């Protein structure tokens, strides 16, 4: 049993893994295609989560009616990851960390459009504030500098925030009766079924065979820790703590990304980037808060 005080550190561990995941992915993009990275990440995560499920003697039976729902979520999740990883090829890990954090903005807007969920005045202000921060970040201080070609990486990552908003909306409306562990395991299996067959070829097999030590460390980190351990920790934390308290830890994720990108990728930490990031975070905070 985890001590009462120690449980508050667990969500932070998950957030540290997720924040550092962009650095590991950035390393891998020098050796593998986005599709290969996603496929390997899923395979290692499935192996770990299956092992945990077996040790815990979980029920692996699945309701056939759930297949369509899980397939839909998996399809969205695969596309989300693909444009995120592809975008990371053309932008910095630091920018990616800040931009990914805007997903709640899209969730709020999609909730308004499709489910008539009301936006308070403060939430609208939060959206405006976050957009200002985004424009400053992507435009490097001048929104008129934003170019579809030059900033394609940032814009692809932003698109992945939008797809995560769609995923969250669909997930919210779908009622699945499985435990968090089995839900994420079934989702990963379905995602692997979608992406692995269209990824594997002779060139991919050769690139995996020639993967460097750094590459293997990176893919194991992504699969076992970021997609495996972190999800288990997060599910445990949500069960043991209030959702709002657990969710608050996510505000630290971009700061972890910026710090680890500086340490391992030699990315610069500029005043403008930190200021833009803080503005984005403030806007997202206003949107997330129940006023």
PLM region descriptions:
Residues 17-46, 92-95, 166-190, 205-208:
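Juxtamembrane helix-loop-helix junctions in multi-pass membrane proteins
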Residues 38-40, 82, 96-102, 170-192, ...:
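Helix-helix packing/entry segments at the starts of transmembrane helices
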Residues 49, 71, 122-140, 195, ...:
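Hydrophobic transmembrane alpha-helices of multi-pass small-molecule transport proteins
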Residues 1-36, 147-173, 193-195:
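Glycine-/small-residue-enriched transmembrane alpha-helix faces in small-molecule transporters
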Residues 28, 37, 41, 87, ...:
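Hydrophobic/aromatic residues within transmembrane alpha-helices
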Residues 48-57, 103-128, 254-275:
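C-terminal transmembrane-helix exit sites in multi-pass transporters
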Residues 49, 107-109, 113, 145-204, ...:
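Transmembrane alpha-helical segments that form core, pore/gating elements
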Residues 17, 21-22, 50-100, 136, ...:
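Specific transmembrane alpha-helical segments of multi-pass solute transporters/efflux pumps
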């Amino acid at each position: 049993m985890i001590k009462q005080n120690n449980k508050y550190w667990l969500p932070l561990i998950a957030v540290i893994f997720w924040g550092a995941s962009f650095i590991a992915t950035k390393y891998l993009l020098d050796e593998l295609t986005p599709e290969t990275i996603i496929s390997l990440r899923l395979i290692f995560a499935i192996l770990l989560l299956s092992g945990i499920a077996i040790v815990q003697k979980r029920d692996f039976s699945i309701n056939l009616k759930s297949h369509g729902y899980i397939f839909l979520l998996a399809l969205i999740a695969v596309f989300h990851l693909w444009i995120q990883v592809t975008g990371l090829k053309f932008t910095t890990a630091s920018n990616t960390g800040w931009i990914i954090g805007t997903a709640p903005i899209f969730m709020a807007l999609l909730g308004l459009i499709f489910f008539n969920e009301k936006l308070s005045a403060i939430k609208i202000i939060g959206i405006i504030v976050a957009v200002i921060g985004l424009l400053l970040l992507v435009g490097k201080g001048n929104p008129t500098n934003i170019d579809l070609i030059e900033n394609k990486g940032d814009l692809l990552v932003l698109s992945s925030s939008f797809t995560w908003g769609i995923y969250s909306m669909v997930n919210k409306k779908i009622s699945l009766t499985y435990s968090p562990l089995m839900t994420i395991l079934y989702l990963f299996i379905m995602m692997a079924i979608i992406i692995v067959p269209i990824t594997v070829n002779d060139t991919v097999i050769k690139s995996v065979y020639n993967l460097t030590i750094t590459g293997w460390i990176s893919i194991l980190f992504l699969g076992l820790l970021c997609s495996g351990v972190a999800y288990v920790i997060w599910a445990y934390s949500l069960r043991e703590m209030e959702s709002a308290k657990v969710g608050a830890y996510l505000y630290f994720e971009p700061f972890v990304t910026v710090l680890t990108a500086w340490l391992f990728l030699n990315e610069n930490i500029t005043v403008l980037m930190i200021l833009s990031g803080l503005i984005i975070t403030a806007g997202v905070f206003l949107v997330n808060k129940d006023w």
